Structure formats: structure tokens, C-alpha cells
């Protein structure tokens, strides 16, 4: 006997599922996890540029600027900002030595 005949039967009104155990806690938990996974996947696809740019550049702290002249600080900040402002999803990492 095939799995199709055990689960679904073709009737005049269409395909019907004979699943009487849909109140099983395992089925409910799997449904909730599936829905949450779908929601998180949609958010990831919608906001992936913001999320990954924040993770890659926002959490890193630059080197200490104590004792560095103000002009060099501004130059470093401009180079750091230009590395983050790259469009089209391409990231550039500038390492200053």
C-alpha cells in the first residue's frame, strides 16, 4: 500500500487529509518552530545589509586615538567611514598599519 493512499484520499470535493492527531503537542511545536523559522528567514532577507554591516563594522572598536594629533584622527575616521559606505553589498576592510 502506498503512503498516498494512507494519508490522502481523492473525494468528490477534492483532496482531504485524514490527520486526526493534529492536536499532538509535537505537531504543534513543529508548526510553531516552522512559522518562527519562516519569519526569521524573511527578516534576514529583508534586512541582511543592515544586520551584517552592523555586525562586521559596528561592533569593532578602532585603536585608541590617545596621543594622536587631531588631523590624523579625522583622516582615520574618514577612511574608516569610506570603507563602510561602499554600496552594492560589497564590503571593503581597510587595515591601517
UniProtKB/Swiss-Prot annotation:
Residues 1-22 are virion surface. A lipid is attached at residue 50 (S-palmitoyl cysteine). Keywords: Disulfide bond, Glycoprotein, Host cell membrane, Host membrane, Host-virus interaction, Hydrogen ion transport, Inhibition of host autophagy by virus, Ion channel, Ion transport, Lipoprotein, Membrane, Palmitate, Phosphoprotein, Signal-anchor, Transmembrane, Transmembrane helix, Transport, Viral ion channel, Virion. GO terms for molecular function: monoatomic ion channel activity; proton transmembrane transporter activity. The record marks 37 as: Essential for channel activity, possibly by being protonated during channel activation, and by forming the channel gate and the selective filter. The chain crosses the membrane at residues 23-43. GO terms for biological process: protein complex oligomerization; symbiont genome entry into host cell via pore formation in plasma membrane; symbiont-mediated suppression of host autophagy. The M2 protein from most influenza A strains is inhibited by amantadine and rimantadine, resulting in viral uncoating incapacity. Emergence of amantadine-resistant variants is usually rapid. It comes from the Viruses. Residues 44-97 are intravirion. Glycans are attached at residue 20. When the channel is activated, one or more imidazole moieties of His-37 probably become bi-protonated. Cytoplasmic tail plays an important role in virion assembly and morphogenesis. This is Matrix protein 2. It comes from Influenza A virus (strain A/Gull/Maryland/1824/1978 H13N6). The gene is M.
